[in-house]
């Protein structure tokens, strides 16, 4: 999982990326390609 400063660029890396908020952190998850996981914060 990458730690990124820009969620927008992480979301645009793959069409299946979703932005989710958990425990005060913002995550980008992708069930099709799990290597595109990222978090911010």
Curated annotation (Swiss-Prot):
Keywords: Ribonucleoprotein, Ribosomal protein
A GO CC term attached to the entry: ribonucleoprotein complex
Pfam families in alphabetical order: Ribosomal_L36
GO biological process: translation
Cell membrane keyword on record: no
Superkingdom, natural source: Bacteria
GO-annotated molecular function: structural constituent of ribosome
Family label: Belongs to the bacterial ribosomal protein bL36 family.
Protein name as it appears in the record: Large ribosomal subunit protein bL36
Organism: Opitutus terrae (strain DSM 11246 / JCM 15787 / PB90-1)
Name of the gene this protein is made from: rpmJ
């Amino acid at each position: 999982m990458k730690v990124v400063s820009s969620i927008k660029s992480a979301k645009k890396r793959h069409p299946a990326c979703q932005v989710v908020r958990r425990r005060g952190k913002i995550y980008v998850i992708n069930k099709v390609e799990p290597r595109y996981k990222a978090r911010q914060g």
